[in-house]
Swiss-Prot record:
UniProt cross-references to PROSITE patterns, sorted A to Z: CUTINASE_2
UniProt organism field: Penicillium rubens (strain ATCC 28089 / DSM 1075 / NRRL 1951 / Wisconsin 54-1255)
Subcellular locations according to the entry: Secreted
A molecular function (GO) term: cutinase activity
Catalytic-site annotation from UniProt: S121 (nucleophile), D176, H189 (proton donor/acceptor)
Enzyme class of the recorded protein, top EC level: hydrolase
Signal peptide span: 1-16
Protein name: Probable cutinase 1
Coiled coil: none
Gene Ontology biological process terms, A to Z: antibiotic biosynthetic process; carbohydrate catabolic process; monocarboxylic acid biosynthetic process
Length: 208
């Protein structure tokens, strides 16, 4: 599975110096499953049809936390296919179950890790559906969730139902109609990389 451009911008801006995150590991985004426990676990669900893009932010934008972050993308059961957007949860039950399993794996495998999470477009529905299903103990380990182009924004009334609103940051661009409960894609839906810096600062601020 691969991380999106937005996930890479977040992960590298928030947590890494140029040599801290191996290029292959970032591209595959499988460090929770295959790697050692880290102080922070970052779980991200990409947008529909989104391929992995190995893009790093400028070094001056980084807030370095060398070697302290495990980056994990949701997949392969989450296929990021277009038809799943039209399902009742705006993504597939398999995708939700997979993301739920990743949160639970992080909490069980790495009991001392602090979990941060994010999603873009259909990936926001994956985050919404999975986090709602978590036990209160696992939810408590999630320090912050950033959602970009939240496809469940209208349905969930600007939150993840049953999850602490103070731990949720929603980015909905002006003119992005998916945030209004439709599946109409406009140019505004592709502008969220510009919010990566602000989202990074917010996520880092939620850590203990």
């Amino acid at each position: 599975m691969k991380f999106s451009l937005l996930a890479l911008a977040l992960a590298t801006a928030a947590f890494a110096s140029p040599m801290d995150i191996d290029a292959r590991a970032l591209s595959e985004g499988n460090e929770l499953r295959n790697g050692d426990c880290k102080d922070i676990t970052f779980i991200f669900a990409r947008a529909s049809t989104e391929p992995g893009l190995l893009i790093l932010t400028h070094p001056n934008d980084r807030m370095s936390k060398p070697g302290k972050v495990a980056c994990q993308g949701v997949g392969p059961k989450y296929t990021a296919d277009l038809p799943s957007n039209a399902l009742p949860g705006n993504t597939s039950p398999a995708a939700i179950a997979e993301a739920q399993g990743l949160f639970e794996q992080a909490a069980k495998k790495c009991p001392d890790t602090q979990i941060l999470a994010g999603g873009y477009s259909q990936g926001t529905a994956v985050m919404d559906g999975s986090i709602k299903k978590l036990s209160s103990d696992v939810q408590a380990k999630i320090k912050g969730v950033a959602l970009f182009g939240y496809t469940r924004n209208a349905q969930e009334r600007g939150q993840i139902q049953g999850f602490d609103k103070d731990k949720t940051k929603i980015y909905c661009a002006v003119g992005d109609m998916v945030c209004q409960g439709t599946l109409v894609i406009t140019a505004a839906h592709f502008t969220y990389v510009a919010d990566a810096g602000a989202a990074t600062r917010w996520l880092v601020s939620k850590l203990d």
